[in-house]
Design a protein with these regions (language model features):
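P-loop/Walker A NTP-binding module and the surrounding RecA-like catalytic core of P-loop NTPases
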Residues: 111, 135-363
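Non-catalytic terminal/linker segments enriched in charged/polar, low-complexity residues
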Residues: 1-155, 159-162, 167, 189
Length: 363
């Protein structure tokens, strides 16, 4: 009987050499793992992406109310403001100045704060209590939203006939690609024939994400191989979408900082190229902003609007953010309508923006 050391107590290199160990592992996976080699990092990332998109498209079991989604902003905004109104009775000058400080630190933007404060200050002589002051603040906020669009109709434009083109822009990390996927899914569910143009030719992951979203949403994607010019992608996409009778074309663009002048010029070029194919397009230039960016989101909005003539804003990641007041600043400081907000991961969590409901949820 062999009384030496057990084989498993010795490293494999003793028997097979370093190179041989790799061969043994390959044979092991081939024989005992169904003939499949270990999944590559790329395949694992794609699998995770597909899983994530599937989860976002699945029906929500617990639908979040807007009040629940905006709870952090409500605590940060009215929660801090109401602490300045302790004691009851009419609001005095000192309390009003404390409210002004809360407004300035709530990501509303300086112009918006000045307008709100002036409105409240003009009512100081009326000896308003805290409830009356809250109502006055609500009315002025809704007035700000009304000044940039119809507060009862904030939907993006879809033409009754012919092709509608939406151009979607924003910085990296704002949730632009995911938002495009959700928009496409919602349009498809409403009966529209939708195409997505993969105009972000700089980030490989963007193309992969859009392809997964297009498959899940059952919409077509135009993503030509070996084409690195985003304007060329946009040009051909508009031509193809028009020729084949699509209702809506959503053009993705490369995410870039609003301070990158050359890249912003490229976006201008894309818009001009789209107009060469369809003189009325793009019918919407949609800016996606991360609500957590706060004051920086207002700077982004100003720069993108100056360069491209933004027609509407989508604010993402509003749920769990204490900076939701930026929606008021987008309207008051930049003069742009907020059209939709993202309050969760699911497709239906990208919602049409109601200024009245929004104001009620934070005050």
């Amino acid at each position: 009987m062999y009384n030496g050391p057990m084989l498993e107590a010795l490293p494999l290199e003793v028997f097979f050499g370093v190179g041989g160990v790799f061969s043994v592992l390959v044979v092991y996976f081939a024989l005992f793992r169904g003939g499949k080699a270990p999944p590559s990092k790329a395949s694992q990332e794609l699998e995770q992406l597909q899983k994530t998109v599937a989860e976002k498209q699945s029906p929500r079991k617990n639908y979040k109310t807007l009040q629940e989604a905006m709870s952090q902003t409500q605590k940060s905004f009215w929660g801090r403001m109401s602490s300045s109104l302790v004691g009851g009775g009419a609001v005095d000058r000192a309390q009003l100045e404390a409210i002004e400080e809360v407004l300035y630190t709530s990501d509303l933007g300086p112009k918006t704060v000045q307008r709100l404060f002036a409105s409240l200050e003009s009512k100081l002589s009326q000896s308003l209590g805290s409830d009356a002051l809250k109502q006055a603040l609500k009315q002025e906020m809704i007035s700000i939203f009304s000044s940039v669009g119809d507060i009862n109709n904030t939907a993006f434009q879809v033409l009754p006939q012919g092709l509608t083109v939406w151009m979607v822009v924003g910085v990296n990390g704002a949730g632009k690609t995911t938002t495009i996927g959700k928009l496409a899914s919602q349009l498809q569910q409403s009966g529209k024939k939708v195409m997505i143009a993969a105009g972000d030719t700089f980030r490989a992951a963007a193309d992969a994400q859009l392809k997964v979203w297009s498959e899940r949403a059952q919409v077509e994607i135009y993503s030509p191989e070996n084409v690195k010019d985003p304007s060329a992608v946009a040009f051909e996409a508009v031509n193809k979408a028009q020729a084949r009778g699509f209702d809506v074309l959503i053009v993705d663009t490369a995410g870039r900082l609003h301070t990158q002048v050359n890249l912003m010029e490229e976006l201008k070029k894309m818009k001009r190229v789209i107009q060469k194919v369809n003189v009325t397009a793009p019918h919407e230039v949609i800016l996606v902003l991360d609500a957590n960016s706060g004051q920086n989101a207002l700077i982004q909005a100003e720069q993108f609007h100056q360069a491209l003539g933004v027609t509407g804003v989508i604010l993402t990641k509003m749920d769990g953010s204490a900076k939701g007041g930026v929606a008021i600043g987008v309207a008051g400081d930049v003069g742009l309508p907020v059209k939709m907000i993202g309050v969760g991961e699911a497709v239906e969590d990208l919602r049409t923006f109601s200024p009245t409901d929004f104001v009620d949820s934070i005050l």
